């Protein structure tokens, strides 16, 4: 199965980039089928490369995947095609950029019914930055609602290509796939071969194998990698022995060596995927390269949330589950924390909201751990009056207001593509979320691209859902981090009968604090069950109460046994009840149901 090294001119390394749900993984299936890497009977289910249940269900690709195919072209030669399937979601854009760096070309897929969307443009820019040759492909042309010529015009405006350079296919029906294969062979250049240089290989993904440790997927940029070589990872500066190297078809195929230009895998008994970071460079220990490949960066989590087991006995199960998940996901970070209201749990850092949802769902589905999640928030920079600077990712550790000199929060630059009819709605949403409007450009007569700058905290919550609902599903968004800015933020505490519930604390902008406090108290009033005594729900900034709701006590009719009789007897019974309730209120703890934490997540509903 392996290729002789002399045939590097017949290698094509390419990836497929697209907005979510534009048919990327289905197209990958057709390519596997036409190259006979798999036949239909082996496929079983659609989307072969999306091998997590969650990936298939949500119709998204979460991890990057790599697979090698052999194709007999019309010119009579056999070509080796290395397809790298990339995630399409904004949370995983760093993974996408590293996958692109392992390729020479890209197929840009655009849905014939939807047209160019925000992440199509974001991924296109990533591909152009990586210097890739791009083949634009319009997919789903078999659907009755497809508008091939309209979408082609959008692509021409966006990329400046000629009409005959745009391919039209239907991945599901298998239309136009042969023409696409020929285009891959003729329009994507072969890799540059530098076999005589010191080894430099780019890691674009890693997965954890319970028996073999971390399996590293890499692209050999320069030099040769042989089985048994001692290798060094630049980021961790650790040394390992290459126990097994090879190529990926549907299974791992061991090889004795991988030459420059090839894509393959490396197994070298790595116990932790954090030692094999995406974007890092692998070199030889005895003949190392002087510098790493450019583009590597430490992935920083953008969204933080507390995860607590519903049943406190499951804390160890949660720890083990997070450890196992982190083996496969180097971007997940977690540290233990305790909460007065929720007990022991973990503070977790995620790339974005989708990443957070996926981790939660995998914890519940694959590991059977039931969890309560606190409100997601971002990391703030707090400058204190004594000159110190602290990073706060949890509202409960926010310093007191008197010690704070200034607070900074992260901002993102966002582009929203929508139909022109919804500009007004989106401007209104932008203003509500403290957005700073920049510009609007027309893509064609009906579609516009709007540019905003937002505080990340306003976006991570439910912005995407709101955007979809006000634009009847037509708008799409993409954002990138642009740095920290000074902001007037305060910590809003929730108190039940004077006791602060730390897990309900949030950090909000001062202009929104009153509105949040009011909504939150009203929401909690409807959720917290009645007690035998009165419960006061208060929202406070520091010692100042800004909103209050009261849950009245459940009352037993203590006068039921008094038929007529002396009023003082009745008064005595009522006084006794009042005393009992007062005593109860002093010792009683209000149980906060799980719905109260979920209420924070959809406060506007």
From Swiss-Prot:
GTP binds at residues 21-26, 139-142. Gene3D superfamilies: 3.30.70.240, Elongation factor 4, C-terminal domain, Elongation Factor G (Translational Gtpase), domain 3, P-loop containing nucleotide triphosphate hydrolases, Translation factors. Its EC number is 3.6.5.n1. One of its GO terms (cellular component) is plasma membrane. It catalyses: GTP + H2O = GDP + phosphate + H(+). It is found in: Cell inner membrane. Residues 9-192 form the tr-type G domain. Required for accurate and efficient protein synthesis under certain stress conditions. May act as a fidelity factor of the translation reaction, by catalyzing a one-codon backward translocation of tRNAs on improperly translocated ribosomes. Back-translocation proceeds from a post-translocation (POST) complex to a pre-translocation (PRE) complex, thus giving elongation factor G a second chance to translocate the tRNAs correctly. Binds to ribosomes in a GTP-dependent manner. This is Elongation factor 4. It comes from Chlorobium chlorochromatii (strain CaD3). The lineage of its organism: Bacteria, Pseudomonadati, Chlorobiota, Chlorobiia, Chlorobiales. The gene is lepA.
């Amino acid at each position: 199965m392996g290729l002789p090294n002399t045939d590097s001119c017949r290698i094509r390394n390419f990836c497929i980039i697209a907005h979510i749900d534009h048919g990327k993984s289905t197209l990958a299936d057709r390519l596997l089928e036409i190259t006979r890497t798999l036949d239909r009977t082996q496929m079983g289910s659609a989307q072969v490369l999306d091998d997590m249940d969650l990936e298939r269900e949500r119709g998204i690709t979460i991890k990057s995947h790599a697979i090698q195919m052999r194709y007999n072209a019309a010119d009579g030669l056999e070509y080796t095609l290395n397809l790298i399937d990339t995630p399409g979601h904004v949370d995983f854009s760093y993974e996408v950029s590293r996958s692109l760096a392992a390729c020479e070309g890209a197929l840009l897929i655009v849905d014939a019914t939807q047209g160019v969307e925000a992440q199509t443009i974001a991924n296109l820019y990533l591909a152009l930055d990586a210097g890739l040759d791009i083949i634009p492909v319009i997919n789903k042309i078999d659907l009755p609602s497809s508008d091939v010529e309209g979408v082609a015009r959008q692509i021409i405006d966006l990329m400046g290509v000629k009409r005959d350079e745009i391919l039209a296919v239907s991945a599901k029906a298998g239309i136009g796939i042969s023409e696409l294969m020929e285009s891959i062979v003729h329009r994507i250049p072969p890799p540059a071969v530098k076999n005589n240089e010191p080894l430099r290989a780019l890691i674009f993904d890693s997965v954890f194998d319970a028996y073999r440790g971390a399996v590293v997927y890499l692209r050999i940029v320069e030099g040769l990698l042989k089985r048994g070589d001692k290798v060094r990872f630049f980021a961790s500066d650790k040394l390992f022995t290459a126990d097994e190297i090879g190529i990926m078809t549907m299974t791992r195929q061991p090889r004795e060596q991988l030459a420059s230009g090839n894509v393959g895998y490396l197994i070298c008994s790595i116990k932790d995927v954090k030692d094999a970071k995406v974007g890092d460079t692998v070199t030889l220990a005895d003949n190392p390269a002087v510098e790493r490949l450019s583009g590597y960066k430490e992935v920083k989590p953008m969204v933080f949330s507390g995860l607590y087991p519903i049943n406190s006995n499951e804390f160890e199960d949660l720890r083990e589950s997070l450890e196992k998940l982190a083996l496969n996901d180097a971007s997940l970070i977690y540290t233990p924390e305790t909460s007065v209201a929720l007990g022991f749990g973990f503070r977790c850092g995620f790339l974005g909201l989708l990443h957070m949802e996926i981790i939660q769902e995998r914890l519940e589905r694959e590991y059977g751990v039931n969890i309560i999640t606190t409100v997601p928030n971002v990391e703030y920079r707090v400058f204190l009056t004594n000159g110190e600077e602290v990073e706060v990712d949890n509202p409960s550790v926010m310093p007191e207001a008197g010690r704070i000199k200034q607070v900074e929060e992260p901002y993102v630059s966002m582009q929203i593509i929508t139909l022109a009819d919804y500009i007004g709605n989106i401007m209104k949403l932008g203003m509500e979320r403290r957005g700073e409007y920049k510009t609007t450009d027309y893509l064609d007569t009906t579609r516009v691209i709007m540019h905003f700058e937002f505080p990340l905290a306003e976006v991570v919550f439910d912005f995407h859902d709101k955007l979809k609902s006000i634009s009847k599903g037509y708008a799409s968004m993409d954002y990138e981090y642009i740095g920290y800015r000074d902001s007037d933020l305060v910590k809003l505490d929730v108190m039940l009968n004077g006791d602060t519930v730390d897990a309900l604390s949030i950090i909000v902008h001062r202009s929104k604090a009153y509105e949040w406090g009011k909504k939150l108290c009203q929401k909690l009033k409807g959720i917290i069950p009645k007690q035998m005594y009165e419960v006061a729900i208060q929202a406070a900034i520091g010692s100042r109460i800004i909103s209050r709701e009261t849950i009245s006590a459940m009352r037993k009719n203590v006068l039921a046994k008094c038929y007529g009789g002396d009023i003082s007897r009745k008064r005595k019974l009522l006084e006794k009840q009042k005393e009992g309730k007062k005593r109860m209120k002093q010792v009683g703890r209000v149980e906060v149901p799980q719905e109260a934490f979920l209420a924070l997540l959809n406060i506007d509903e």
